[in-house]
C-alpha cells in the first residue's frame, strides 16, 4: 500500500488495485499489480469492517494509485456509505490522474465533492512537454493543468507534486521554468517537491545502468528548486520540499515565504548549511 505522507494516520481502504496508467518511466510503485477496480460492495464491506475496530476515524484515504478513476455513480455510493458508517469523518482523499478528472463532467465533479470527497492528490511531475513525453506520463502539461483547474473549480482541495532532476542537467532550467508556470496556472492548495531517485524495475533506472542517463547532483537539484521558487506565482499555496528524497528541507507558503526559502537554498549552495548525504535519501 502506498500513501501520501499526510495520510499516515488515515484509515486506508483499497478502492482500486494498482494504477490505471502504470507506465511512468520513473515509478516502481505498482509494477507488480494488475490494475483493477474493486467492486463497490467490497469497498463498503471494508468500511463496515473497519468500524468494528476503530473508535473514531477522522480521515479516510482511498488507495491505490488512481482511485478517482472509479465511475462517479459508484463513488457516490461509497461516499454515502462513509457518511453513514463514519459520521465523524472530516476528510476523504485519494490519488487522481489527469484522465480520471478530465473524463468527468463539471456536474459530476461538483457532485463528487459535495458528497464528501475533499482532497485530490495529483502528480504534475513536470510542466515541460519534452520531459512528460520522456517519462511516459500519459498526459500533456495542458491536460494536467486543465485537470487541476477543473478540480479546483469544483471545490476540491488539490495537492500537487513535481520531481526535481527529471530532465537531467541539460534540461534542468527548462524543466524548472515550465513547472513553475504550470503551478502558477493551477494554483494548487498544496505543492510538494520530491527529488528523483532511481530504483531497479523502472525504465529510467535501465537508462541509467546503460549509461544513457546521468542523475543530477545536489547542486543542480537545488538550483532547479531555486528557479521554480523564483518563477512560481501562487499566493497562499502551501509549499513543501521536505520529503526524504530531497537534499534539504524547505517549507513555507507561496508567495509570502518565497524570499526566505530562496535564502535557505543559497545557504546550502554556498556551504553555509548542510546538504543531505546520498546515503540518507529515501523514497
Language-model features: locations:
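Catalytic cores of alpha/beta
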Residues: 107-109, 167-185
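Auxiliary Fe-S-binding modules of radical SAM enzymes
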Residues: 1-7, 181-283
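Hydrophobic faces of well-ordered beta-strands that scaffold small-molecule active sites
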Residues: 11-13, 58-60, 90-96, 120-122, ...
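Conserved, mostly hydrophobic/aromatic
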Residues: 19, 27, 43, 62, ...
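Conserved SAM/AdoMet-binding glycine-rich loop
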Residues: 51-153, 233-234
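Canonical Radical SAM [4Fe-4S] cluster-binding loop centered on the CxxxCxxC motif
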Residues: 2-42
